[in-house]
């Protein structure tokens, strides 16, 4: 068993094939169904801010962390997220490095990472220390080659759902 496949074995992984304009609706819909803390990954700083604004306007308490935010801001957001003061933390990959959140049940890949190994690091934020976890990934038509690379790396075919608003 490779370290990659063992790391992802305890995580329920699902992919949503979705058109780019529908991603926002899908995210809000999924977050309204769940009452748990969720870490959402965005590929860009700008995207993280946009997602956080969208969620806040939709009545879902969220904050974004990324490299343009101060260390104090990132620390406050992390503290608020861990305490449940905010339910959704939107992060870029670099900002999320080294973050340890116990019992995080759900990770959402709003954007697929450019590098398959980054996917493994992202979903590894959930399902830690014997807990189960869920990783939901949004995949637009232009991201399908990235999804194939991820499945090749993990050796796992993800449960797929097609989202239509």
Residue ranges and their predicted role:
Residues 1-165:
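Conserved helicase RecA-like core
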């Amino acid at each position: 068993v490779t370290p990659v496949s063992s790391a992802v074995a305890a995580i329920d992984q699902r992919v949503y094939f979705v058109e780019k304009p529908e991603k926002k609706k899908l995210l809000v819909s999924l977050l309204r169904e769940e009452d748990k803390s969720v870490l959402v990954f965005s590929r860009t700083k700008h995207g993280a801010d946009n997602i956080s604004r969208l969620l806040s306007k939709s009545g879902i308490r969220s904050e974004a962390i990324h490299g343009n935010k101060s260390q104090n801001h990132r620390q406050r957001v992390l503290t608020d997220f861990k305490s449940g003061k905010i339910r959704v933390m939107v992060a870029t990959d670099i900002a999320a490095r080294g973050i340890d959140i116990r019992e995080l049940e759900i990770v959402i890949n709003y954007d697929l990472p450019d590098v398959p190994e980054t996917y493994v690091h992202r979903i590894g934020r959930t399902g830690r220390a014997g807990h189960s976890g869920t990783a939901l990934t949004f995949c637009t038509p232009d991201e399908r080659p990235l999804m194939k690379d991820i499945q090749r790396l993990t050796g796992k075919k993800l449960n797929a759902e097609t989202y239509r608003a």
